[in-house]
Amino acid sequence: MDQNGASTEARSKRKQPPTSPSTDRPLKQIKPEVDAHTRNGVPKSPELEVVDDAHSVYSLEEPIAPVAGAVHDTAEWQKTIEGVVKSVVSIHFCQTCSFDTDPAISSEATGFVVDAEKGYILTNRHVVGAGPFIGYCIFDNHEECDVYPVYRDPVHDFGILRFDPKAIKYMSVSALQLRPDFAKVGVEIRVVGNDAGEKLSILSGVISRLDRNAPEYGEGYSDFNTNYIQAAAAASGGSSGSPVVNRDGFAVALQAGGRADGAATDYFLPLDRPLRALELVRRGEAVTRGTVQTQWILKPFDECRRLGLSTDLEKAVRTQFPKETGMLVAEVVLPQGPASTKVEEGDILIKVNGEFITQFVRLDSILDDNVGKTISVTIQRAGENLEVELDVGNLHDITPDRFVSVSGASFHDLSYQQARLYAISLKNAGVFVCEAAGSFRFADGYASGWLIQEVDNQPTPNLDTFIEVMKKIPDRKRIVIQYKHLRDLHTANTSITAVDRHWHAKIRIATRNDKTGLWDFKPIADPVPAVPQVSRRANFVKMSSNYPNAVDIVRSFVRVHVSMPIKLDGFPKMNKQGYGLVVDAEQGLVLVSRAILPYDLCDISLIIADSIFIDAKVVFMHPLQNYVIVKYDPALVNAPVKTPKFATEFIRKGDETIFFGLNQNFRPVVAKTVVTDITTVAIPASAITPRYRATNFDAITVDTNQASHSGSGVLIAEDGTVQALWLSYLGERTSHSGKDVEYHLGLATPNLLPILNEIKSGKTPKLRILNVEFQTVQMSQARVMGVSEDWIEKTEQADPERHQLFMVRKVDSGHGGDGMLEGDILLTLNGKLVTRSPDLDVMYNNEFLEAVIVRKREEKTIKVTTVATEEIETDRMVSFCGATLHRPHQAVRQQISKIHSDVYISSRARGSPAYMYGLAPTNFLTHVNNIPTPDLSTFLREVKKIGDNEYFRLKVMTFDNVPWVATMKKNEHYFPTIEYVKDDTEALGWKRIIHECEDGGAREEMAIDNEAGGDEE
């Protein structure tokens, strides 16, 4: 922070592309990465890249590697490629919400047509995803059509998409024939796909292995129980789902993954199981998938011998399969599964139903053909043969195909993928949290991966039980939740949360529909009304101190928890907590920092005396000085809450005072200290994401390190008179770390007394402000800028402590009218010399001010119009295609020179059309289909004319005045248009309106994730 509020952050002046540049693209996998430890803007732990073999790391996402040595293309290859490219499509898609192992994302990949008549495309399972999917494909001639999931394998990395062949009018669609039997060591291949996000890339290689185990990709989706094919082709991002073709033009494998360390090695999925699935889908039959809930891996004979493989058995296997070099060994056996008491880790698989088994393909085939039946399995353990009977389960039954949304979060049963990774039982494991938000946003920070064990002291072993428990819980009831994280199943966590059934009223269930390719949403429970709060008794802690009157201020502090269902105004969080100061105990008025409570579309909960929970409502928000007044019902509080005495005189530099604060651990701290400085500061503006910041105020600093660790507190005299408030001030987001800076500073109490007295009298202050941001100039600067010696002398006499004047640093845009200009030096307002921030307070109650200024070395007297603050706060927002739109808030007007439109993008949801087509926070939407949209009403009117799944044009202006045009496709199923309007007649203070789509989809509940500078969407 500096005196001028300068910030070193930089925003890209150009528009953001729909996807990241290829250098930032996550390669192979579809999840764009910004750096080595982030996934699509969400911090990712380094340990997510799991070592498969010694010193080897494999990833669905790998950095772009140098292309392997190109093989000279013969005429035969050229003819083959010409035919293949007509079957290859570029897939642009969104996984619209977090589900199982997959976060909500928007990206690109590759697929290829495998049935031109019925319209089937083969691609990867990590492209199709386990959850809701929307996407379209682009053919070689740039014709486009929508695609819908038909099948995604529960384990193996392939999925099948459906398209309408009739939609392709200008080229003959051809299909590639799947020939898994042609994949052999030494075969020359080409990978034809959307490599590194480019339209078409053709990479060459030679198959080197057919028998490597499936690579582990970490905590996300991983394939297993199959062998992979290895080749050096150096494919990268966007190549997921590419066909691997031989010289004759047959697809011999499916591109799936590769190395994360820059090596050119690639891993392909064999096509045996995709071919079987395709044939069943063609016939309209169900794709049966069997399992004994055991992961097998291929181990060479030397390792098998160490595990106890007998010589006789090795000889028998080698004789029957002379080309085999290993056998299948049990790696993970799930507890309470079909094999849990019969098969152990390290057991060598010998026979199934009397047949020697050495390959995954044959094992898969037997299991898939025996779902619901019993198979006979021979294993060898420490040299001893064992015969066991195993019941074959249905793999689809342990793969979630539904999720429930309640209180802003989403849940489903634990999946086989997660259970296999952590070797835990699928039975009664608890409910998996796939989107930890709303009432279930736990303080530990993980967005998913939680297993809910108990809710409101009732066990929740599975999703159905969880739904029944949640149906009965009233709105706003505080409940106890017990939960574990998959990473640490040893630790049971306990939290208390308030159940939100008002912002997120209905419990809704989403079920996968493989016929339509969509997920069907259905409300299953209306909210149970809240139980009225009752009066409760409590006592405050008593602190022993040398300053008993001062520490008694502890009776004036209450803990504040703010929960925001929607991100507005560029604010980076959806939950904040801190402390507030009771300013009137009789009326229940509490002062809170705007770094904790940025806007009034929220739930405010106070904890009084660390004992009583009570709800509060916003009464007043100060536009400049960083505080909010909230009100609770004092009749519900039977506790000795104290109204402090406030000083009417400004504290001065050098004065002794007592610092009383609440530190990061919410513990009170006391220290005798001295005021080191009182200066007019400028909180740095956040260039990446404009959000509320205090301006034009004098900040107090003190000589104690406790102050820097305390976000709330007071400076108080020994007799208990509060001299200043100690508040948190939200600052800039640093460009190097992406973290938000908070400053802790003091605000003298005389600044707030006039407003506080007005609120106490029952009035709501209607302030007027100057639409400018000032910075201080010293006399040396003022003289150069044209301030006369007379005024310099008057300044020095009027304020012996601070020889300074105010210069206009920035004029807020969008308010219009004549007034001060940037660079003007302010001398007087209504005849009073202005040398300190409190001298500006005359603006609060005057529509017009007479100002004496120096402009370009000329002294002038001008009439300045102040701006009413009633409309400064955001009072209306629209969620459209995943973008949160509202009028540019005050922070935007403070930073920008021209307001292009009153339709401003504040945030966007991952996996949404807004994200997919490149709309970014801080953009302005100025036209819809060439019709100007200067405000939200016009915008809503125009977008209502657009049909579902229909393309439209948006004219967009970036924050830095660069215009561009976006073409988007509307999606009402998953992203209905929802409007929130401030309405004091509503119980919540806001009215919710759903436009067009009454059922709503994955984002109807409005727990929209923000996108701010690529760090948080």
Curated annotation (Swiss-Prot):
EC number, UniProt record: 3.4.21.-
Stretch list, region Disordered: 1-46
GO annotation terms (biological process): apoptotic process; positive regulation of apoptotic process; proteolysis
Pfam families per the UniProt record, alphabetical: PDZ, PDZ_1, Trypsin_2
GO molecular function annotation: serine-type endopeptidase activity
Enzyme type, top EC level: hydrolase
UniProt biased composition (Basic and acidic residues): 25-38
GO cellular component, one term: nucleus
Domain called PDZ: residue spans: 305-383, 879-960
Active site feature: 126, 157, 239
Top-level division of the source organism's lineage: Eukaryota
Keyword Flavoprotein: no
Main location: nucleus
Localization: Nucleus
Record keywords: Apoptosis, Hydrolase, Nucleus, Protease, Repeat, Serine protease
InterPro entries: PDZ, PDZ-like_dom, PDZ_sf, Peptidase_S1_PA, Peptidase_S1C
Stretches for region Serine protease: 88-278
Function: Nuclear serine protease which mediates apoptosis.
Family, per entry: Belongs to the peptidase S1C family.
Record protein name field: Pro-apoptotic serine protease NMA111
